[in-house]
């Protein structure tokens, strides 16, 4: 795919939706699945990242969970990169209607994008399960060892979805509705067989444009790669 061809497609789009994978965030160091990171976590905590980011572990060992959440997620949140700012420019031009992502580092919103649907939550919307009050990442970082709600004293729930918890059905429905209304689907940093990329099945528009650093057999389903 030539840059010029992609540019012409995006310029003609009026209702672009982006499926934003973890590729760009991983390049910023925001990746819980790197082998070296997983090894380091297991050495320090005696558990893998996937075992810690689990509802049972959170409920049984909240102090350890929040140590990991602060040191290994919030302190590794990175900064928006050129991908995020390109999406912001598309939004400013009135072409990009929204972003759907499984990432929870909130990079696109921090770049200035407004309609970002986080399927697995995000680190700046930690919440009190009792009264619903919202707390950002800075609050969690500054309240050790356990962040409690200022209003009712309840332990704050992390803003990210934990393994063993149900995803929010309303959020999923919003994402499906957004994708199904798009005329161009821009898939970035993932392939069409991933959990996020497979949501392209709800797309009924004109073009699927795929931007990824690695090839995948599912690429042939895209109109431009």
Please report, for each region that a protein language model flagged, where it lies by residue.
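Conserved catalytic core of sirtuin-type NAD+-dependent deacylases
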Residues: 1-225
């Amino acid at each position: 795919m030539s840059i010029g061809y992609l540019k012409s497609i995006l310029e003609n789009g009026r209702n672009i939706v982006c499926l934003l994978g973890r590729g760009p965030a991983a390049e910023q160091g925001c990746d819980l699945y790197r082998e070296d990171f997983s090894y380091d976590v297991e050495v320090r905590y005696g558990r893998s990242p996937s075992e810690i980011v689990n509802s049972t572990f959170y409920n049984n060992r909240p102090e350890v969970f929040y140590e990991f959440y602060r040191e290994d997620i919030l302190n590794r949140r990175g900064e928006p990169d050129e991908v995020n700012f390109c999406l912001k420019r598309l939004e400013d031009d009135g072409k990009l209607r929204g972003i759907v992502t499984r990432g929870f580092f909130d990079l696109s919103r921090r770049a200035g994008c407004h309609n970002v649907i986080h399927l697995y939550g995000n680190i700046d919307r930690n919440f009190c399960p009792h009264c619903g009050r919202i707390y950002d990442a800075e609050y969690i970082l500054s309240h050790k060892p356990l962040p409690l709600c200022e209003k009712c004293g309840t332990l704050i729930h992390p803003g990210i979805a934990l393994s063993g918890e149900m995803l929010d059905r309303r959020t999923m429905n919003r994402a499906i509705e957004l994708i199904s209304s798009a005329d161009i689907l821009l898939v970035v940093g993932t392939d069409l067989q991933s959990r996020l990329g497979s949501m392209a099945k709800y797309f009924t528009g004109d073009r699927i444009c795929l931007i990824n650093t690695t090839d995948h057999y599912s690429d042939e389903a895209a109109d431009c790669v």
